[in-house]
């Protein structure tokens, strides 16, 4: 799909539920007219428009969320200070993902967090996970989101071992468009781009979740934040001013991880690369093989699935020191296209002023090529995760 073509959209038909009361800006109908205008500003294709319309129509029937209305189905994962479960919302019959965050905080702080999370109601994009609502109950904040049946890319990676470049092309497009939407339409940055915050589904959609919309929630969860710091940019780790350029570093680091099958710091040595790719892999301008890294493994990371990484675990401060002071990670030569290598290198420039920005990356050859490439993302995902593919086959939804 050409990036600049703006399709002519038929009017959105989102039916409000009779149970839905007037919003803060007036009647539900007036709110929907405003929403329709905002959606028509987005460059959506027909399929994206229909899916967003269907989600918003379903959401309009949900009404106020209450703890008693949910039936737990299974646990989806844990992280970022909360546990995510797959639930059914009994009044509507909808399947949702419910994130429970336990916080020992005063009522005023809790109410501020719930208020700040309401901004998520306005985040409607094919590249952002849908939001049903947030509420407080029994010492926990609940954030209810669209359920993505493919899970997160870190879960997909466990099954796939490595994710092919053409698939990562579609992932890169979705992440860039999601970041651009958050920045341009809501003036917010993500702050926590990593494989576990990129969700996918059997329809071929790729969406961002867990972005930093609530400053108060970020502050309240500061103590649980250490585990995500391995994706933070050098400037953020040093406590200096940071911007959306920091999200671009995190995306680049995530792409290297998804490409080679493990967190890329410290870099894999020649033996491990050979185990990963099944053949000797050379690197560097002179074509030298990867040298054996003297560095330990990063903290909390298992020994490589390829059995070659027997180094002791790296302490968290060693890892953060490495990110700030050592050369940035890169993709090995001879395995990936030059376009993809160059794209990743531009994301992982340590100086944020020299790092590529969103606009530059959207116009990069790797992205332009990936936009026109026919890739059956949904088919690949369903085969990898052994999911049932929806009856209507879809190409990558980006």
From Swiss-Prot:
It catalyses: L-seryl-[protein] + ATP = O-phospho-L-seryl-[protein] + ADP + H(+); L-threonyl-[protein] + ATP = O-phospho-L-threonyl-[protein] + ADP + H(+); L-tyrosyl-[protein] + ATP = O-phospho-L-tyrosyl-[protein] + ADP + H(+). ATP binds at residues 76-84, 99. The keyword Metal-binding does not apply. The keyword Kinase applies. Its EC number is 2.7.12.2. Activated by phosphorylation on Ser/Thr catalyzed by MAP kinase kinase kinases (RAF). The active site is at 192 (proton acceptor). The modification Phosphoserine is found at residues 220, 224. GO terms for cellular component: early endosome; focal adhesion; late endosome; mitochondrion. Pfam families: Pkinase. Residues 70-367 form the Protein kinase domain. One of its GO terms (molecular function) is protein serine/threonine kinase activity. Belongs to the protein kinase superfamily. STE Ser/Thr protein kinase family. MAP kinase kinase subfamily. Catalyzes the concomitant phosphorylation of a threonine and a tyrosine residue in a Thr-Glu-Tyr sequence located in MAP kinases. Activates the ERK1 and ERK2 MAP kinases. This is Dual specificity mitogen-activated protein kinase kinase 2.
